[in-house]
């Protein structure tokens, strides 16, 4: 498992809220999926409301 740094933003009441998170995943696609599930569940947002800008290996 590698660690990936994911940056992006999600829609909130006041516009978009930026975020940067470190996740462990086997590849970049799984890191994106992990972000969609964690940010979506923590902030009650659907996938179209989450915009991932960059995924890079940490």
From Swiss-Prot:
GO terms for cellular component: ribonucleoprotein complex; ribosome. InterPro entries: Ribosomal_eL20 (IPR028877), Ribosomal_eL20_dom (IPR023573). The keyword DNA damage does not apply. The keyword RNA-binding applies. Gene3D superfamilies: 3.10.20.10. Keywords: Ribonucleoprotein, Ribosomal protein, RNA-binding, rRNA-binding. One of its GO terms (molecular function) is large ribosomal subunit rRNA binding. GO terms for biological process: translation. Residues 37-58 are annotated as: Disordered. Residues 48-58 have a biased composition (Basic and acidic residues). Part of the 50S ribosomal subunit. Binds 23S rRNA. Belongs to the eukaryotic ribosomal protein eL20 family. This is Large ribosomal subunit protein eL20.
